[in-house]
Amino acid sequence: MTRRRWPATLTHLDLLRPARRVWTSCLADCRLATLEREVVGVVREDDIAGGLIPSLYFDFLRSRRAAPLGRVLAHNRDDVLTLVGLLGWFGKALTSREELSAAELGGLGRLWEPVDVERALDYYRAALAAGLSGAPAQAVRLNLARWEKRSARWDAACTLWEAAARDAGFDPRPWEELAKFHEHRRRDFVAARSVVDDALGLAEGAGVSSRVRDAFAYRRARLERRLLPRG
């Protein structure tokens, strides 16, 4: 546009990053077409594929026939309207949680985490309370437990680690955290060894890597040494 400055004072707002944080765990992808269909609830009819637009533009440069560009302009118009719809979704979601799914609550936790940890933790707790399940729930539990640990809220952290340890499929991370808590915070070596024994039993059945099993075995041997009578 002949190098003229944009007259508006508002800065550019890129919705791609927040969209990825919110929906990456519950949608197949975060392409605009997917967000338009699954979030905004719009299905386009007779839309031109974005990959065809460059060739239509070069055809126009050669032929000077502008008619085929009508579908391109309609496509771009619909893209902008979808972004308006997404912006409206974010505006509503950040002021009211009533219609949000458990997965979206977890995604909003990820969105807030870099700038407002306590608000992020509130969303994570809400996601779990709303019935978040599977791998997204496991990720939220462990992330939430990490922040509870940083704040020395040990009861809350242990509750989350215990829930994560009960998750279907063996995940060594909560077991390791529980073992470290009992050994280093409570100085309860018997409880720590019991956690490690349970973890080793599950690890054997789950067929995890030898590196994981060796780490637990090393921890158990150290606990055994600490339990020996001091002479």
What spans do the regions from the language model cover?
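Short coil turns that delineate tetratricopeptide repeat
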Residues: L132-A135, G169, E204
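Structural register within alpha-helical repeat arrays
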Residues: L108, N143-L144, L178, A192, ...
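Metal-dependent phosphoesterase core characteristic of DEDDh/y 3'-5' exonuclease domains
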Residues: M1-D78
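Structural motif corresponding to the intra-repeat A-B loop/turn of tetratricopeptide repeats
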Residues: P114-V115, S151, R185-R186, L227
